[in-house]
């Protein structure tokens, strides 16, 4: 019998600013072992909050290979500031508004039943809201990012 499991949810980025810190995200389905992970965020700490600045990051992982993009735009300034980035070693990234500094960058450390684990190569104390979608099951094979 073939199976396909999909789960979506939200978690908050760790506020531990130690480089190399791991963060476990527990899934509602304890039997689901992810084969595909999507992460996306607008780098906000409050849902549905208005900000003059725009930040967006989204990324993908197959558990071995990660890739993400990030863009930020600082508006209501004399000169608008825009930064973009692509990371072949990360699944989610955030920049410091108004600079070219990456303030947080995570890759996938592992997939296992009922969870995925991120490693924050760069971290800060901002509790960004991050959304995820995972897929798993026997119907999914040969996933490549």
Residue ranges and their predicted role:
Residues 1-145:
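Surface-exposed molecular-recognition determinants
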């Amino acid at each position: 019998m073939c199976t396909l499991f999909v789960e979506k949810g939200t978690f908050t980025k760790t506020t531990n600013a130690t480089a190399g810190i791991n963060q476990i995200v527990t899934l509602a389905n304890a039997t689901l072992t992810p084969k595909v992970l999507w992460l996306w965020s607008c780098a906000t700490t409050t849902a549905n909050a208005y900000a003059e600045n725009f930040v967006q990051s989204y990324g993908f992982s197959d558990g071995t290979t990660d890739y993400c993009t990030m863009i930020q735009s600082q508006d209501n300034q004399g000169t608008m500031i825009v930064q973009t980035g692509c990371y072949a070693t990360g699944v989610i990234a955030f920049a410091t508004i108004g600079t070219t500094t990456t303030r947080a960058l995570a890759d996938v450390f592992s997939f296992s039943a009922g969870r995925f684990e991120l490693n924050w190569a760069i971290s800060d104390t901002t509790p960004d809201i991050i959304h995820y979608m995972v897929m798993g099951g026997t119907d999914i094979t040969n996933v490549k990012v």
